[in-house]
């Protein structure tokens, strides 16, 4: 049974700039469109049911362009999915994640992309936007904090990868909280 992705009519913001002036934009992935290779040490999922992956979330391409203008270059992608924290839609949160090519990391692109998506989700009526990352992924923790997310704590043994269970650091962003890019 196919499940409709969360917020299928979400309007993604046009673009925003990194501190170095690179422009970042998000655009929805087209069905079957290849994604950039953005694998990292945190992506070894082991046995994975691809049908589950395709049915439970939505995706956007992360693209960059030089500050002076030029072509948009895909450097990664983002995903988001619904999570319920209670029995009603008011208890729904949207969890987001970003994955960037190795050469795009450390440039502020992930910070801007996560902030853009959080702003779009808030404008689309989502109250709680959340993210999580491995406790060892300090770079992503800093990126989320720069994007305006608030660290909430650690979810112990919350994620399973090929080498076993991993603790995750949880973050959230609520409407009205400061974010990296203007709303």
Language-model-detected regions and their locations in the chain:
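Conserved acetyl-CoA-binding loop-helix of GNAT-fold acetyltransferases
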Residues: 106-120, 138-146
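Conserved acetyl-CoA-binding loop of GNAT-fold acetyltransferases
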Residues: 145-155
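GNAT-family acyltransferases
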Residues: 1-104, 120-129, 136, 158, ...
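Alpha-helical hinge/cap motifs
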Residues: 97, 104-111, 153
């Amino acid at each position: 049974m196919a499940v409709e992705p969360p917020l299928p009519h979400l309007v993604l913001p046009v673009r925003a700039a990194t501190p170095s002036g690179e422009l970042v934009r998000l655009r929805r992935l087209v069905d079957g469109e290849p994604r950039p290779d953005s694998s990292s040490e945190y992506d070894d999922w082991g046995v994975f049911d691809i049908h589950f992956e395709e049915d439970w979330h939505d995706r956007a391409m992360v693209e960059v362009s030089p500050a002076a203008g030029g072509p948009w270059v895909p450097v990664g992608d983002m995903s988001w999915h619904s999570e319920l924290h209670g029995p009603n839609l008011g208890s729904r949160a949207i969890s987001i994640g970003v994955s960037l090519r190795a050469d795009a990391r450390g440039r502020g692109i992930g910070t801007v992309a996560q902030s853009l998506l959080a702003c779009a989700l808030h404008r689309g009526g989502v109250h709680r936007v959340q993210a999580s990352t491995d406790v060892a992924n300090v770079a992503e923790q800093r990126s989320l904090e720069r994007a305006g997310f608030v660290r909430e704590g650690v979810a112990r043994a919350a994620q399973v990868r090929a080498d076993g269970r991993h603790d995750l650091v949880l973050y959230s962003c609520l409407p009205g909280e400061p974010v990296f890019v203007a709303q």
